[in-house]
Amino acid sequence: MNSLLEEGRGHLAGLLEASQRCAWHLCASADRVPWPVTEKELAARSMDLALFEPLAAVNERFGKLQDLLGGAMRHLGVLCGEDTSTFLRVLSFCAKEGIIESVEEWQACRALRNRAAHDYGTNYAATAGHFNALHAQIPVLIGVTLRLAAYAFQTLGIRAEDPRFAEALRSHG
């Protein structure tokens, strides 16, 4: 196998592992939050780092995971010989292969991620709504993480070097 192809395969393996690690850390952070969060609870605990640190981690890791998955999906498309000239084509390929449920679901998740990248301010009702919406979409991203890894292994024989994170994700409630 030529070195460029081998390098590309190694890069995808690294993206898969980074995605699985990030997904596991996202779940671990989310597990530290008493869901659903409410406006009243956020206001009452506004200086409580035991609540706000894991919320900040959920916010950060949700966006990071989507970024990692987007890069991994594009790279998978390249290695599979698909047209990756636009991300919409990448999403269409991934939807066709069952990696994502639908282009629309991914785009809705992405819109939520884009909101997560901005300051959520002091409106506790909006903040609670934002975090509860993120929490509701975590299973979507976990599913994409696992299906992407399964597809890469089944079609290209590529997998993350460390299987522990994928195993932990599969057994996570």
Q: Whereabouts are the PLM-identified features?
A:
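Solvent-exposed interaction patches of small proteins and small membrane subunits
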Residues: 1-173
